[in-house]
Amino acid sequence: MEALGGYPSKSSASRAGLFKVLLSVALCMGSLYLLQNKLSKSRKTKDFYSYEVKDARGRTVSLEKYRGKVSLVVNVASGSELTEQSYRALQELHRELGTSHFNVLAFPCSQYGDTESGTSREIEAFAKSNYGVTFPIFNKIKIMGSEAEPAFRFLTDSVQKIPRWNFWKFLVSPEGQVVRFWKPEEPVSDIRKEATTLVRNIILKKRQEL
């Protein structure tokens, strides 16, 4: 029904105003839901093993498979002055502590000069054929800048340090938290002590649960 002169009645205007209010409320509620959902997801990703990465062949790998074990995460390179000694020491540590409770996880990075120019599969083949590497080598990543690999960014954020060169090493607990990190020049013998202690704790805990 229209009022005289063709203007909308007061009831029509009221309904239009009410509709606008309800629409605004619905939009606000929707925005809040999306924000809450986003925050909820971000809270769930709170440790290293919560992330997914790519292997050398580009396949998605959930780091959850390493939960419950000790991990030594390293940014590796094929053409560095540290390559041979580092790969050999890492392989020895990986073999010594065994894959039941410990793993070296290698992430190639090409942001440090020309020390890593090959493809991920070439890097993997190089490490295996030259140094007998049996630990996993993942897809080549970026560590610095806005395109940094999220899993590796978790490590650097945890220690508030960004690697300045190849072969920085991050020791990750069975729960996915960073225990300590080492610069390239620091001896692997120091890492061995820390990693061995964590592995022993895992074994003791399992024995107590029997």
UniProtKB/Swiss-Prot annotation:
Keyword list, A-Z: Membrane, Oxidoreductase, Peroxidase, Transmembrane, Transmembrane helix
Record-listed E.C. numbers: 1.11.1.9
Catalysed conversion reaction: 2 glutathione + H2O2 = glutathione disulfide + 2 H2O
Membrane topology value: Single-pass membrane protein
Tagged with keyword Transmembrane helix: yes
Domain of life: Eukaryota
EC top class, as a word: oxidoreductase
Any single GO BP term: response to oxidative stress
Keyword Ubl conjugation: no
Family listed: Belongs to the glutathione peroxidase family.
Protein name: Probable glutathione peroxidase 8
Protein's organism: Danio rerio (Zebrafish)
Lineage: Eukaryota, Metazoa, Chordata, Craniata, Vertebrata
